[in-house]
Amino acid sequence: MPATQLLLLACLVWGLGARTAQLRKANDRSGRCQYTFSVASPNESSCPEQGQAMSAIQDLQRDSSAQRADLESTKARLRSLESLVHQLTLDEAAGPSATQEGLQRELGALRREREQLESQNRELEASYSNLLRDKSALEEEKRRLREENEDLARRLDSSSQEVARLRRGQCPQARGTPQDVPSGSREVSKWNVETVNFQELKSELTEVPASRILKESPSGHPRSEEGDPGCGELVWVGEPLTLRRAETITGKYGVWMRDPKPAYPYTQETTWRIDTVGTDIRQVFEYDLSSQFLQGYPSKVHVLPRPLESTGAVVYWGSLYFQGAESRTVIRYELNTETVKAEKEIPGAGYHGQFPYSWGGYTDIDLAVDETGLWVIYSTQEAKGAIVLSKLNPESLELERTWETNIRKQSVANAFIICGRLYTVSSYSAPDATINFAYDTGTGRSRALTVPFKNRYKYSSMVDYNPLEKKLFAWDNFNMVTYDLRLSEM
């Protein structure tokens, strides 16, 4: 029993210290020895009753609950404080990094903005440079146009003086005689009859010239709505002036034109051009200004509702007149509204290679314009290949009057009409060709001519007369050229 002894010894020592402890020893009912240890209360003089004890216990429990609640509240506040301290610690640790990241983002945005500003600055500098170049080009163009204007003024003055001399009778008049047939026609034996040169040279022998020129009155010709338009007989063709050159192979043959009676919104300066190499010719290039035409910058491209044939098209009173592909139909296409206004078959006209000019190219139907109006040049089986002329109504395309010549169409290279007279070109490739025949619709007579005509580029596929400018327009082997003319007094 060492433990019991130690316990009793401790209690005894504690009792001695307190001087109020009592130890009793007695046997219980079963005979077992019991030790009872009593200690006097330091505060209570007597023991409370049972009810008072319970009340005291409850008070103690309440105090304990309150203390426990205070303890839990304190613990909660401590946890909150610990959380706040932890968050503050994290913020302090992450603060410099976040600030640095924000500064880097701001710096990146500023750099991007600077790059955009620099790019805009470069674009502005490039635009300014382009404007300076355009200004220089415009100044150069202005200078060139001024020089051209001065040259035109000089030529106009020279032409006026020439007209004055002609009116005074200082220029010898052309005489039509049998000797007007070119000397080259008497040298046919020098050529191989199978060569192209011989075929072209034959054109100079096809027509028998009249023995003399008959002086016709103006009343014998189709009348112009403007009265006397300054008509006369062709006596001289100048050197070709090259305006521009086609860019692609489709421009080896072609037709270009200006409207001698322009209708709004077009002007005398508006130019149209068609490249005619190909099987589906529909594009018509339109140039509002002469400078655009010279530089090759069209202001509009028309796409025709049906393809055209060859180089016989013309523009007159705001409409494009052309031959429909592989047909004898002439079509009037109004350029401003881009609509077909009229179609008309030319009775009996050959087409698609039946009666072309000597160079070929399906030039069976050739439209022309002069001071008196719209014409069509063609041939028929009944005419046995001779050139037939018909005056057309420009609105309805009805044939108003027809003339049949005795000039074989396939023996000449091209034809045009001035003041009601048909003129033909002897060769499309010879550098020194001639205007070799003239047919007068006023008298129904024809005669031979020897007016020199230059094929500078040796392949003239189109020759037309512009009555407003009094010039020939031609397409010579990719090149668009003009010729000045001189007409005698009627």
UniProtKB/Swiss-Prot annotation:
* Residue ranges that the Swiss-Prot or TrEMBL entry lists as coiled coil: 52-169
- What SMART domains does its record include? OLF
Q: What GO biological process terms are annotated to this protein in UniProt?
A: bone development; clustering of voltage-gated sodium channels; ERBB2-ERBB3 signaling pathway; myelination in peripheral nervous system; negative regulation of cell-matrix adhesion; negative regulation of Rho protein signal transduction; negative regulation of stress fiber assembly; neuron projection development
Q: Which residues are glycosylated?
A: N43
Where is this chain compositionally biased, Basic and acidic residues type? Answer: 146-157
| Signal peptide as annotated in the record | 1-18
Record: residues binding Ca(2+): D366, N414, A415, V463, D464
Residues the record annotates as the site (Cleavage) are R212, I213
Instruction: Show where the Olfactomedin-like domain sits.
Output: 230-489
Q: Which cysteines are joined by disulfide bonds?
A: C231-C419
Q: Where is this motif: Microbody targeting signal?
A: 488-490
Where is the region Disordered?
146-188
Q: Does the keyword Glycoprotein apply?
A: yes
Q: How is it modified after translation?
A: Palmitoylated. Undergoes a calcium-dependent proteolytic cleavage at Arg-212 by CAPN2 in the endoplasmic reticulum. The result is the production of two fragments, one of 35 kDa containing the C-terminal olfactomedin-like domain, and another of 20 kDa containing the N-terminal leucine zipper-like domain.
One short Pfam family name for this protein?
OLF
What are the protein's UniProt keywords?
A: Calcium, Cell projection, Cilium, Coiled coil, Cytoplasmic vesicle, Disulfide bond, Endoplasmic reticulum, Extracellular matrix, Glycoprotein, Golgi apparatus, Lipoprotein, Membrane, Metal-binding, Mitochondrion, Mitochondrion inner membrane, Mitochondrion outer membrane, Palmitate, Secreted, Signal
Q: Which domain of life is it from?
A: Eukaryota
Any one Gene Ontology MF annotation carried by this entry is: metal ion binding
- Chief localization: secreted
Where in the cell is the protein located? Answer: Secreted; Golgi apparatus; Cytoplasmic vesicle; Secreted, Extracellular space
Tissue specificity of this protein:
Expressed in optic nerve head, ciliary body and retina.
Tell me, in a sentence or two, what this protein's role is.
Secreted glycoprotein regulating the activation of different signaling pathways in adjacent cells to control different processes including cell adhesion, cell-matrix adhesion, cytoskeleton organization and cell migration. Promotes substrate adhesion, spreading and formation of focal contacts. Negatively regulates cell-matrix adhesion and stress fiber assembly through Rho protein signal transduction. Modulates the organization of actin cytoskeleton by stimulating the formation of stress fibers through interactions with components of Wnt signaling pathways.
What is the protein name given in its UniProt record?
Myocilin
**Native source species:** Felis catus
